[in-house]
Swiss-Prot record:
At alkaline pH BPGM favors the synthase reaction; however, at lower pH the phosphatase reaction is dominant. Inhibited by citrate. GO terms for molecular function: bisphosphoglycerate mutase activity; hydrolase activity; phosphoglycerate mutase activity. Gene3D superfamilies: Phosphoglycerate mutase-like. This is Bisphosphoglycerate mutase. The active site is at H11, E89. It comes from Mus musculus. HAMAP family: PGAM_GpmA.
Amino acid sequence: MSKHKLIILRHGEGQWNKENRFCSWVDQKLNNDGLEEARNCGRQLKALNFEFDLVFTSILNRSIHTAWLILEELGQEWVPVESSWRLNERHYGALIGLNREKMALNHGEEQVRLWRRSYNVTPPPIEESHPYFHEIYSDRRYKVCDVPLDQLPRSESLKDVLERLLPYWKERIAPEILKGKSILISAHGNSSRALLKHLEGISDEDIINITLPTGVPILLELDENLRAVGPHQFLGNQEAIQAAIKKVDDQGKVKQGKQ
């Protein structure tokens, strides 16, 4: 029996999403389409009469800005927003900044799919010579995390994402839900997938088939033990959502004529 409702979403589109590049921990802002996606998400939640008590985000701009725009559309700007690196996007290591389609050309579509969607496969780690290494690790936000800078990841599998996310879920988010508070989590594709895997009991093998489009609210109904009652539900125009999911899936494929 459903006792709690939780809204999770992947942030609105950023420029690197549009350019089909691995964004990861690079702090890209929302582009114009992403701004509209976030506002539309807020409008959908308003139409469904959602009222939030607390919002959780990563410490990346695109996650935070999406949450702000949603709250603005809801007229709930006063709702507290808490940010943690533990909700950050998956760290894609040496793949950061690279184009997914070009990677598929060079390494094959299946390898790129494993890097993007599998549970256990970890991309090569980021090195200090990487063009975005210092932009990430010199940023002040990573010097005030709950782990030392030298213990932050240099690359992650989805399994790693879940392992760093779960303590925050159990210690900070879950207790608020159990108090009866209405929670919104504005996160990223892979931190959201990791959380869905945990709450829905999705297998290591099946998680590769879960794809989340940008800027679409996801409803999870949870029981008294915070386990999902039924599968997650995308809120909005289902035909448009399925088209958006296919678009995300196709990012790691080589377009016809280039093979």
